[in-house]
Amino acid sequence: MVVIGEKFPEVEVTTTHGKLKLPEHYIESGKWFVLFSHPGDFTPVCTTEFVAFQKRYDQFRELNTELIGLSIDQVFSHIKWVEWIKEKLDVDIEFPIIADDRGELAVKLGMISPYKGNNTVRAVFVVDATGTIRAIIYYPQEVGRNMDEIVRLVKALQTADKGYATPANWPNNDFLNEKVIVPPANNMDARKKRLEACKSGELEGYDWWFCYTDLKE
């Protein structure tokens, strides 16, 4: 089982778009990717999730991020399900879906709960352009995911790469709104400079350890 900060395991997978090598395929194109598992094709909650992901696909692409689904099904099932979604719901699923028919990748990624049978839970892995796992979320099979939160998560992680932290519910925090947090000073000299920056207006803050600013693009 993998954890945040590790490299995504190197695997070759069969998808609805052909064979792909992960994470190599996305590293070579300099892209992040969100890998998400679903319990099974032709199921109601999973269908609503795929439609929701597709409707936000452009938002992910604007963040230089691709989507890739996964379940313990055969590729033929994925193809028929995607066709059904197009025919019945008029939504064209553009991103690939991994056919992990033996469940090998699902086991490696800890997507299967011994208390929930042989299907995957609703896992989400956010992987950056270096192939490093940046975030992992698990949802139970009976609870559909909030795709806007996953978009927000990717934005927040990319903001962290600029040297900032994000407050609760960012960018709609209760008192900081869309502002981002400057990491606390870690020595006395930095503490002094941080206080001076707040006093001069370069930063805003409540104390030397709680400073914030507008996100600079």
Curated annotation (Swiss-Prot):
UniProt keyword terms in alphabetical order: Antioxidant, Cytoplasm, Disulfide bond, Oxidoreductase, Peroxidase, Redox-active center
UniProt-listed SUPFAM superfamilies: Thioredoxin-like (SSF52833)
Keyword Disulfide bond in annotation: yes
Compartments where found: Cytoplasm
Note, other: The active site is a conserved redox-active cysteine residue, the peroxidatic cysteine (C(P)), which makes the nucleophilic attack on the peroxide substrate. The peroxide oxidizes the C(P)-SH to cysteine sulfenic acid (C(P)-SOH), which then reacts with another cysteine residue, the resolving cysteine (C(R)), to form a disulfide bridge. The disulfide is subsequently reduced by an appropriate electron donor to complete the catalytic cycle.
HAMAP family: Peroxiredoxin
Descriptive protein name: Peroxiredoxin
